[in-house]
């Protein structure tokens, strides 16, 4: 017997974001510093054991020791757990994809769910499939997969807060990928979305700047894009300027992850001046040794996809 239209259960005015905790799970991110609740990682598997002779062909700078690399990755994951962060994993990666551990590039989180990347380098192009499989297994909604001629990597999206998002154009994220990401953020009602032209020398802009606290950012002064710094200042951020190329390049001084406002994890290495600058500004700095993993040209921020942060 047909059901009368008057008896249909019609949609209410609730937004997807409002319904997500009940129907999908407690996911979402709209800042770099809100209390971190859940992350997605890839513990390096067989893919790091048979690196080619030409390391540059897989974007690595040095050959890594698999046993030491996994031990350091496990220590990073345990530090997250000790600080109340749920750690989830990508369970599979093809054996020719050693960069799969740099999960930040594969997933960009939004208040409504994940944007799945399309890496800009051919050697990384297949990794996103396994990130998408992990998201589906966890119940994280995928709001968009970058497609067509677009390329985009998650490290080219930085949330200052819900009212300001920075989206790069770089060697890894092209104009079409930037457009697709901007369109999703505009649909979600983000107050201001600023396109950042990333210097040619950089893969992404997350190695040039980071958010440390509600109104505190740190930048590598000689390379930080003007439009990014200007946007942050316009929104009331104080800017700390790092000048040491050695600390930024080799110590990965800006490759940090905030656990909450004013409290960050920083890779151990040649970055003591930058760490002191953070501490002098009132930021608590935790250290973790990732020097073996850093030989793959990335560190903790590159290896961490945020799945859930508290709203500021």
Across the structure, where does each feature detected by a protein language model lie?
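The feature marks the mature, well-folded catalytic cores of soluble enzymes
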Residues: 1-312
């Amino acid at each position: 017997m047909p059901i009368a239209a008057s008896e249909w259960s019609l949609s209410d005015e609730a937004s997807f974001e409002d319904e997500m905790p009940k129907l999908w799970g407690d996911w979402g991110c709209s800042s770099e510093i809100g209390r971190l609740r859940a992350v997605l990682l890839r513990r390096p598997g067989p893919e790091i054991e048979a690196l080619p002779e030409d390391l540059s062909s897989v974007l690595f700078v040095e050959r890594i020791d698999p046993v030491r690399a996994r031990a350091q990755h496990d220590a990073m994951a345990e530090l997250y757990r000790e600080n109340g962060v749920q750690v989830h994993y990508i369970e599979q990666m093809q054996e020719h994809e050693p960069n799969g551990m740099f999960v930040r590039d594969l997933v960009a989180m939004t208040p409504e769910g994940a944007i799945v990347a399309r890496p800009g380098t051919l050697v990384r192009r297949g990794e996103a499939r396994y990130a998408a499989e992990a998201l589906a297994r966890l119940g994280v909604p995928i709001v968009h997969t970058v497609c067509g001629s677009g390329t985009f990597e998650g490290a080219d999206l930085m949330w200052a807060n819900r009212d300001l998002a920075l989206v790069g154009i770089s060697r890894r994220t092209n104009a079409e990928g930037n457009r697709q990401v901007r369109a999703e953020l505009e649909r979600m009602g983000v107050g201001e979305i600023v396109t950042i032209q990333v210097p040619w020398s950089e893969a992404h802009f997350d190695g040039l700047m980071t958010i440390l606290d509600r109104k505190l950012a740190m930048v590598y002064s000689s390379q930080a894009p003007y439009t990014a710094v200007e946007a942050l200042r316009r929104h009331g951020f104080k800017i700390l300027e790092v000048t040491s190329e050695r600390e930024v390049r080799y110590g990965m001084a800006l490759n940090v992850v905030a656990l909450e406002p004013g409290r960050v994890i920083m890779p151990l290495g040649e970055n003591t001046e930058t760490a002191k600058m953070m501490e002098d500004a009132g930021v608590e700095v935790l250290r973790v040794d990732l020097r073996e993993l850093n030989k793959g040209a990335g560190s903790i921020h590159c290896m961490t996809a945020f799945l859930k942060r508290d709203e500021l």
